[in-house]
Amino acid sequence: MRSNSIFTKEIDSEAVKKSSNLRPPSTGSSNSNGSDTASPKKKKKGFFRSLFGSSSSGSKSCGSPFTRIWLEYFEVSLRKNDVDHFRPGYWILDTNIDFFYEIMLRQVLLKRPKEESQQIYLLRPAMVFFLAQAPNPLEIESALPPAMFDASFIFLPINDTNECGIESGSHWSLLVVSVEKGLGWYYDSMSNGNTNDCNLAIKNLGILLKKEFRVRHMKTPQQINDCDCGLHVCENTRILMYRLLQKPYVPKVDMNLDHSVVDSVRLRKALMEVITSLLAAYGSKVPKPSETHTDPEKDKKIFSKICKTEELLELPTLSAVTSDSAQPHSLPASMPSSQPQSRSESLPLTHPNSEPNPKLDSQPNSSPVRRPSLIKVKTASTSVLPTSILQRPPSIVPRPETAAIQHTQQSIEIH
């Protein structure tokens, strides 16, 4: 949950430096001002413990394994403490979300055509914090990434911290903004979470983009503990990003997550396996200093459990739209899942296939207008998930007191 390492980042901007103090590396402790108490540092024997050493206790000097960099993945550096927070029972830090977002950027967005990848921007937690807390957002405009201003959809991980220089923040939630529609979809795995911080972020974003936004609270799977909210943000980001990448080819994109499943245990395990696989394949720096890119075949194997690279490569591109005589196909609203051994080990996937648009399908094939939805796509045979997987398991059904205050939201249609 916590955002313990936001201020360890170096941001070359006078506006940012004036608005905050740089923060020392996190000690891994959690000391909330709210009702949550620190999650126990669980020790787990096995491969991961032998790889990363002992549990985070004792002295943490400057040269200790807890502060030195264990893995550099492009623009994100993970220390021992950051890696520990992927283990069960730990709050997710902003660095953990950075790592997940970097994977989505490198393994998903940048492998799509440029005209598609530029439509989606994953804003990092540190930038979201500065945006939400800035008294005058125009003063930090130069510190924000230029690509954000050209995107159609912006993903903002929201943290409820409003303090600089100390460990703070106790909850993560997700805000997805459609710039064209002037609309934000808010996903909170605790229905009584940080609405105020969501409003601050979208208000300042509207000032920067010179646009008024309205926010819709979406039905979202509820977490069953106090430490998985950051994983919900990561998984919800992946699901929604995959759906939005299908936007040129399907008549409607469903932004609801009420039927989705977030398997936090499996996601934590998958991310730890990614880290160990990267270390084994590339060493502590990815890519290596002598290289500018990574090996696609290695990456396909390393990231297959998180982003299903092979499924992405089968998605059509704008140039793949064939003649008007092509038959329409609906793309899967989420990635196909391999047959799980048990529900606890199944990758959290959601949503059945989108329904075809009868108005488009009923039009004659001889129409001179090319419609992106009329394409020939080879879909995977496993694209339709079993009904048992699509149904929400009892373990994530919200408690009565949280379910009573959830806002009912209809599907959002995006053209």
Swiss-Prot record:
GO CC, alphabetical: cytoplasm; nucleus
Gene Ontology BP terms: meiotic cell cycle; protein deneddylation; proteolysis
Presence of keyword Phosphoprotein: yes
Biased composition (Low complexity): 26-38
Keyword terms of this UniProt record: Cytoplasm, Hydrolase, Meiosis, Nucleus, Phosphoprotein, Protease, Thiol protease
Residue numbers of Phosphoserine PTMs: 35, 367
Protein name: NEDD8-specific protease 2
Lineage summary: Eukaryota, Fungi, Dikarya, Ascomycota, Taphrinomycotina
